[in-house]
Structure formats: structure tokens, C-alpha cells
């Protein structure tokens, strides 16, 4: 349980979740859940407790609300991450995270949440109906794609 709700100065905001202060080698997968139903919660728990999930550091179920409720077509987000301490551990950690995400496919929304999409690909799932407009803007104003983005909109 992460319980870090308290008054704090802006300099401490990065500590709220307890992530390491420096980048860490890891592999993660996320699934935007269409609704936070009993079946989706049961699917999350089954995936989290599956033997393959032993390679994961943590799994999270995040309720989405506030401003996200108007722009993100889902009720919750499931996220799994595993640390990759040595390169040899990468295949096992990646397989565990992918298995976790696949187990939640029956409950998945058609879109993905950009902040939790670890690797580029499938811009349609990230940007939805905004993709055509974004492509037009980027093609007109940055055709050489000088402005780097983790999730490019042009092919």
C-alpha cells in the first residue's frame, strides 16, 4: 500500500510513489481497463498471483478519475513492472509483464494510456480520434521530426 498523502513542499512531489530517484532498468506493461467490475478485479488478482508474476517487482491497480475521466476511455489502469538487474533477467521479466497484461485482455479498453505505455508503437491506441489531427500538425510544423517524442505520430 502506498500512503503518502500529506502536505509536502513541491521539491518532494517526486517521492509520492516511492520510485527510485535515478533511472532503473525495468520492463513494464499496462492495460487500460474498460470498467472496474468485479470480473476485472478478479482478473487482476488472478494475474497478479499467477506463478509467472513472481518475476515482477510490483503490480498496481489505479483508479482513474478527475480530468482523466473525461479524456481516457477507461475506469482503471493495471500496471506491472519488474526490475532487470542483469541483462540475462530481461526475457523472464518481459515474459512475466506480458503474461500479466494478456491475462487482462478480456477487460481491456480499446485505448492505451500514454503515460504507462512503455514502448513506441500503435499510436492509434494511444491517441485515438486525435491521431489524424496530430499527424496533420506534425507534418505541417515538424516534418523532419526534430522534436523527439517517445510515441511518434508519423510513420
Q: What annotation goes with each model-predicted range?
A:
Residues 1-155:
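Soluble FAD-dependent oxygen oxidases
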Amino acid at each position: 500500500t502506498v500512503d503518502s498523502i500529506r502536505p509536502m513542499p513541491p521539491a518532494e512531489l517526486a517521492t509520492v510513489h516511492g520510485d527510485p530517484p535515478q533511472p532503473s532498468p525495468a520492463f513494464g506493461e499496462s492495460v487500460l481497463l474498460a470498467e472496474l467490475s468485479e470480473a476485472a478485479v478478479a482478473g487482476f488478482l488472478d494475474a497478479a498471483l499467477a506463478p509467472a508474476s513472481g518475476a515482477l517487482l510490483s503490480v498496481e491497480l489505479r483508479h482513474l478519475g478527475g480530468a482523466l475521466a473525461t479524456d481516457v476511455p477507461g475506469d482503471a489502469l493495471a500496471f506491472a513492472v519488474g526490475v532487470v538487474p542483469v541483462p540475462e533477467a530481461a526475457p523472464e521479466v518481459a515474459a512475466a509483464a506480458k503474461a500479466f497484461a494478456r491475462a487482462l485482455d478480456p477487460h481491456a479498453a480499446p485505448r492505451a494510456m500514454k503515460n504507462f505505455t512503455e514502448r513506441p508503437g500503435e499510436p492509434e491506441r494511444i491517441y485515438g480520434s486525435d491521431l489524424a489531427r496530430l499527424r496533420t500538425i506534425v507534418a505541417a510544423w515538424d516534418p523532419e521530426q526534430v522534436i523527439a517524442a517517445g510515441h511518434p505520430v508519423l510513420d
